[in-house]
């Protein structure tokens, strides 16, 4: 029945219902004299409930338990917490327990902190446990050690004898009685955590077997009952916030989870497993051997599920396993079947296992990407730095499947645990294990560390106890068309001295079904047989791909129809000819093709080696067969004459060394039998170079145009002082805006500039109408290329002096005004180049500064009345004329880019002189109940009478090719409009707005300023 006052003591009402006579509830604390235990079936919280310093002891049962078989506690958005409490010591009790189903739902927060449970059932127990709809779930600094462990003396850690394995099965079942375990959750059927909104956190908890979860299998059949075994499950799904398991410690195995099926599904936040540890305090490792397949003690730094599966699927956030440790096997995970689909980034880093599998230990592993990337980095173990594929149970075959479907999978810096250690991405303990390595589209599966599969017939260092007479097949891209790459590129000089750091081995038959298998940068791959008639084999400098004798039923032959060359790896003086070999026959089929493979076509053809002729001794066919070991046919280069930027020329391929064409060392390469040579012939004797237009970098000289316009914006902000008749000291503060749209012109780039900032001005206005003032300001903004992915973020600092005076010319008042301005601007350019090969952007960055100046002298005079056609018009509309002389220009500093396709821009400059002329109109407005305002309108024509277009020299750093670059060729004729409005808001205060439009062919500039001033 639902929880009520009639069925429960007043003390528990204070805790579970926050008794408050209908007023707002507040957290309640239970004192040590509270009567326990409490029993119920349906419990509702009307307020926050806190259990603090509760002691259940050895005589009491669960603190909260079910009257019958099932218990439901509904939080109604309140908090339930246990702090500094001790649970019951009795075996079948916990803090909260139910005989069948336990449901905890709709809490604002469910929190257990600094509690101790010595009972077998831990803290929360039931055959089925469900936590759903909570705001957050927190288990922090709890201890769930089970006291019977103390019967094992510390001085003589004699482990219990392992249970004998069934004759028909060689499963990975543990050898320790299930009674000797302790976990926060103890379930027989399932634990499900779902729909948590803010976060799930298990931090710094301690236990024996599985600190957080221990699955207690109910095997009635095994005990004489008529039932069947029930596999417990641990599920975390549909959680919105972060899910984290950090610094949990298990003394015997499974740092977080021990036994049962584990599933993380459809969670939106990140999932983090960090710093979890599984020790082996019972000494199970010493009591068992790998041959028995019973060794789980100290296994699984995070999850130890030796008889079941672990799956991650549909999770939208990142997944991180780092700094987890296992005394046994599986630094993060030990399981029977492991499956992971990466919808976001997944990282296994710095995990360690003293035995096998620094990150993962399992006989069946299936890992794939679905929009995210997967990185295995700096994991360590005795066998398999990142992954150890263990032997499958009797009668079954292990499998390793890695699929980079939509996102890369990378193994880098994983090591064996001996010192100094060997690089090791994966160790496959059985030769019968099948291997499927796949990549789709532009995704890549990259092994910077080797993969080794046992080959007992070849004398492997650790032969498989159950070696199959027929090694498992190795398939490349059975379900993809991307790149599977083995490379030794990341090895340090000392690591390169140890050949095992770069050697991968598969004893079975290797088939390239699609896409490409890449072996490059000194990597070695040996297999039983090699067949590449559908997919491509791409080889790089120093690579070796060979079919070697060793396993039964292998004919150790190599047959290829599609070849590729990792071109960039051969363009260094330290290149080495690749080897394609076999202990049997090596065949390059008739009609074979060769692809020029390169990550960046632009970078390759920037290489100065292509100025002249070049020979590349690409690959040597090698066979140990006494006769007819090598069969070679002519090879056709695909897209040999494809258009490209950079140095121009053509390619050819032949099994005969060409004459008078040096290699990348500058030497004539040796004439070696069965070697395929590639030859480059330049289009001209002087190395014709074709520049990619997007690499011109016209934003650099155009920055002088932009800086000049910014100074003009600064000048327009002073318009209030030029038209004012006030007398006194005037201080003003302005907001400035600058918008310039420069259109593209044929193959010339345009730009779009947006800048905004402020201007502060101080000026003295004298009684004779003269003024003198100074101004300071800054503008911040960005200039974007109109044609390419390039932008320049700049900030400009400006300082100016200005003045005005009145002069009498032939009895007519003439206004003379002037200004000199200096600007210092800092520019940071970021350029992106879209790479057609990778379908990604390459990036480069640089920064430089400009020094700019602007000066003008102008006069406002009624010369329109001197001209008969304009006299009457000027009088009717009270128009006057003006004329100015303007000079603007600047210098840009040199700069060198960093990143991809780098360039060097030399110092540049640009200058412009113009003679604006036009008319001025004034209008005064007096609107009732509104302050008076004065409108000034300038219209005119601005011809540029002398110009040096901004320019500089751009140099390609890779080859020193220099190209003069000019800014946009602006039209020399422009029309402009200036509108200024002053609002007299106070006797000593003014508000004003100024707008200017400068329009010329293929460029439009808008300048806006507004502000306030104060007259003193």
From Swiss-Prot:
The keyword Cytoplasm does not apply. It is a peripheral membrane protein. Keywords: Cell outer membrane, Cell wall, Membrane, Secreted, Signal, Transmembrane, Transmembrane beta strand. It is found in: Secreted, Cell wall; Cell outer membrane. PROSITE patterns: AUTOTRANSPORTER (PS51208). Residues 697-1016 form the Autotransporter domain. GO terms for cellular component: cell outer membrane; extracellular region. Residues 1-24 form the signal peptide. It comes from the Bacteria. Belongs to the PMP outer membrane protein family. This is Probable outer membrane protein PmpH. It comes from Chlamydia trachomatis serovar D (strain ATCC VR-885 / DSM 19411 / UW-3/Cx). The gene is pmpH.
